[in-house]
Amino acid sequence: MRLVVTGGGTGGHLFPGIAVACGMRDRLPGTTILFIGTSRQVDRIGLEGLGFRQAVIRSSGLKGMGTFARLRALAQLPLAVFQAARILGRFRPDLVLGVGGYVTGPVLLAAKLRGTQVCIHEQNSVPGLANRLAGRIADRIFISLPCGPSFPGARTRLTGNPVRGEILAAADRRRPRPSDRPPTLLVLGGSQGAHMVNSLVVAAVERMVADGGRLRVIHQTGRRDLDMVRRAYAKLELQAETADFFRDMASVYLQADLVVSRAGATTLAELAVMGLPVLLIPYPHAADNHQERNGRWYAEGGGAVLLQESLLNGNILAEEITTLLYNDQNLQVMGSRMRTLARPEATERIIDQCLELVQTRGR
């Protein structure tokens, strides 16, 4: 089996692809896998040490760009398709799986022109532009949420969002917090950070400490705000672990009691598997407002509380955190409901569908 996974640029796109690639290699140990992605740091760090082949093509996104940037992206498209075709010609894949992000478009188009079977996975409740276009040519379309996007029914499968194996394994090791340990708040702004989330949480924690609250904080800040957040917590003499990007999310999740996060689909899938309750602050400028729609599904299921960034300040967020963080029963109920929304079998479902496609083609 020779598999190409294409996508990336954010952890939300990359990590489901990694989950499927690792699962395929476990299922068929002789599988050779190539990732075609971006040159961004998250792709490089995320794939580090996994033993997959890697390639990068030059491509740019269209959505949310100005006129000049769009024209430049369109001008790059023929070259990107040519680069992708050359890479695919050398690798000769049996199947190409697109996991979202602008880099997928040229690769999937080149694959289809070569007669290679193509699948896509959509993590969000609203598909990105690349997947909306790719859905027209894909042989199989995998969606993550029951409230997910409308694609051609005969080719669409509800699979859930693949979660990396080390996080699935960690979910079985999660235990209640020891009574002598202060509760731990985990703060996630996505793989690239979120300035407003960082600022709001710092203000909220300052208020909580001033009111005598005991807590520990683990905070993924992104590169931009790392120093600011570290200085704020040091001034409070708070027990805190901060990083621009955590590589071992499984161990981070195991330490958390409550999460404050954006509403990216892959983060939500991981939190659901772990059974972690979450206060969600959706990114208000996300394409087609997909983060709010992602978060609403988990909030309606009882595992999350959905907050609007425009209505928040440090005091309000402190009250929301305090209501949950110091009430073990509330945390337990929300965590249990969050776990019922998980689809830990998503990776295996996608692999089954991919292998069925390849086997059908080989008959």
Question: How should each PLM-predicted stretch be described?
Answer:
Residues 66-95:
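An amphipathic, basic-hydrophobic alpha-helix
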Residues 343-363:
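C-terminal alpha-helical cap of glycosyltransferases
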Residues 93-95, 238, 254-269, 276-277:
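Acidic donor-binding loop of glycosyltransferase active sites
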Residues 31, 53, 112-172:
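Active-site-proximal region of nucleotide-activated glycan assembly enzymes
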Residues 36, 41-42, 46, 50, ...:
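Donor-nucleotide binding loops and adjacent catalytic segments primarily
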Residues 3-8, 30-76, 223-225, 310:
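Conserved nucleotide-sugar phosphate-binding/catalytic loop shared by glycosyltransferases and other
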Residues 330-344:
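A short, well-ordered alpha-helix in the C-terminal region of glycosyltransferases
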Residues 261, 277-288:
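Short hydrophobic beta-strand element within catalytic cores of glycosyltransferases
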